[in-house]
Design a protein with these regions (language model features):
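Short, conserved loop/helix-junction motifs that constitute active-site signature segments
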Residues: 99, 122-126, 150-152
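Short, well-ordered beta-strand core segments
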Residues: 82, 104-105, 129
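P-loop/Walker-type NTP enzyme "switch/lid" segment
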Residues: 3-10, 20-95, 123, 169-177
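Inter-motif core of Ras-like GTPase G domains
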Residues: 89-112
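Conserved C-terminal guanine-recognition region of P-loop GTPase G domains, centered on the G4
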Residues: 115-134
């Protein structure tokens, strides 16, 4: 099993969306997958419950966890890929997620403040980690500056990104089992390639 933790000490940067959507991308690619919701707000769990209430349940399990149960629950799950959603303001949960993860992914917007916080988070993480640009437009200067900062600071980052699309916000409480994955198929393909080889670009 490969465990991927999504974290950032800043809120509103797509951790929950990324956890659910990458899990769905993994499922579509033929892998068994699940999500551990370690955010006390329970956003991933709410997504799963809302999708089920709408008659379109997710095709993978979402289970809640906390700092005391995260490691045990992760070890008990038998899936190919496990994605862990975390809260931005709970250092104990964040560390517990990092401790069990094979790869830590830090989603971030491309604003200078977001990039600065993301790089700080990246530098504090032990083990393999990479930044993921989320809700971005490659045509804008902020995007180009973010990519340049990654290179200048020797920060590992996905070449895949999640574009800025209003439709992404409409995915909440849906099964997302059909239709576009809005770049998360590319994110998972790169992630899977990185975890399959020791020389992939998103590990350090």
């Amino acid at each position: 099993m490969t465990i991927v933790a999504y974290l950032n000490t800043k809120g509103g940067v797509g951790k929950t969306t990324s956890s659910i959507m990458t899990a769905e991308a993994a499922r579509r690619a033929g892998f068994s997958t699940a999500v551990l919701d370690a955010d006390p707000q329970g956003s991933a769990s709410e997504w799963a419950e809302g999708a089920a209430a709408n008659g379109t349940p997710l095709r993978f399990n979402v289970e809640d966890a906390n700092r005391a149960t995260l490691a045990r629950k992760a070890s008990n799950l038998e899936v190919d890929y496990l994605f862990v959603d975390t809260a931005p303001n709970d250092p104990a949960v964040i560390q517990a997620a990092v401790d069990v993860a094979d790869l830590t992914v830090i989603p971030t917007r491309s604003t200078p403040a977001d990039i600065h916080r993301a790089i700080q988070t990246y530098e504090s993480v032990s083990g393999s980690a990479a930044l993921l640009l989320w809700n971005v437009d490659p045509r804008f200067q902020l995007y180009k500056q973010a990519r340049a900062l990654f290179e200048e600071n020797d920060v590992a980052a996905f070449s895949a990104e999640v574009p800025s699309r209003e439709d992404v916000n409409k995915l909440w409480f849906t099964a997302v089992e059909v239709g576009s994955l809005y770049g998360y198929d590319d994110v998972f393909a790169e992630l899977h390639g990185a975890m399959s080889t020791t020389t992939a670009g998103v590990t350090r």
